[in-house]
Amino acid sequence: MLDRLVLALLAVLSVPYALAVRLRALAYGAGIFRVKQLNRPVISVGNLTVGGTGKTPMVALVARLLMARGKRVAVISRGYGGSLEGKTHIVSDGQRVFLSAAEAGDEPVHLATAVPGLMAVIGTDRYAAGLLAQERLNPDVFILDDGFQHLRLHRDLNILLMDCSAPLGNGMVLPAGLLREPPLALKRADLVVYTRCTGAEAPAVHGAIPSCRAGHVLAGVELLPGGERQPFTALYGRRGVAFAGIADPDAFFASLREEGVDLAATVSFGDHCPYGEEEVARLMAARRTAGADFLITTGKDAVKLGPVLSRLGIVYAAVLEMSLMDPKPLETAIDKVL
């Protein structure tokens, strides 16, 4: 009974929220709110729901596709969770990474580290961050990370990611559901990419919008810091403790087990969690209790371990990549922008 009352209250609260975000989108569409435009093409990657749909590996995939076409690529990120959040800074010029994850947030630092040659800037004002990149880095094209709701910046290609198993969550907007906007916002997308697909046909919520399917692939492990990529078989015969501070840690742990990694224990932290004394203590206690030989985590978590890494013993980072099952729609959409 109590659960129903709570859900009913959340549903009531969802109404003004949905109305507010819908009116905001309409105001931008009608020109009441000004949309600013950079003088380079902008490709936005975002989603309708909160939580993990694979934005970071998708940004990396799009960046690699663009770079394979000879383009200089810069990612514009908010810098969420970093001490410099709200300020405009260059994270990487494609050769060097200037800021730590503690300063710039885990996602831009992870992307700049994982994709050689990728430039990255941060700023709450993504237009100002883009102007800084144009002046200092001279990119050919921008990728706007988590940009579907950042309507203030014009984009030439609007890529929307949707989880294959639950593309609209429970169909309700925050706080009763997972949707950041009402489902009508889907119409702003130029391309829908269904993520976490396992081979089955994707749902058909995209209507006439071009779509493709993608799956998450663990491509191996790297011994920290800076080790070469190895297959998961390098871990066979040993027991590990997996940990993650991401939106869906359980999916990460399940993927490791599917790769044959013997996990003696798992430890979940909050999304974008910084690693300090409390987190180190939890990890070391879990490792001792389980009698594990190593720790293993995500690439996004790995970039935050620098100050504490030497205290954790043997630590591996799993390499997560996005694999397209039908790449043609994405490649066609990108080529139209260039």
From Swiss-Prot:
Pfam families, per database record: LpxK
Family matches, as CDD domains: SIMIBI (cd01983)
A single cellular component GO annotation: plasma membrane
Transferase found in the keyword field: yes
GO biological process: lipid A biosynthetic process; lipopolysaccharide core region biosynthetic process
GO molecular function, one term: ATP binding
Binding residues annotated for ATP, in chain numbering: 49-56
Pathway as given in its UniProt record: Glycolipid biosynthesis; lipid IV(A) biosynthesis; lipid IV(A) from (3R)-3-hydroxytetradecanoyl-[acyl-carrier-protein] and UDP-N-acetyl-alpha-D-glucosamine: step 6/6
EC number: 2.7.1.130
Catalytic activity: a lipid A disaccharide + ATP = a lipid IVA + ADP + H(+)
Keyword tags: ATP-binding, Kinase, Lipid A biosynthesis, Lipid biosynthesis, Lipid metabolism, Nucleotide-binding, Transferase
Homology family: Belongs to the LpxK family.
Name of this protein: Tetraacyldisaccharide 4'-kinase
Provenance organism: Geobacter metallireducens (strain ATCC 53774 / DSM 7210 / GS-15)
Biological classification of the source: Bacteria, Pseudomonadati, Thermodesulfobacteriota, Desulfuromonadia, Geobacterales
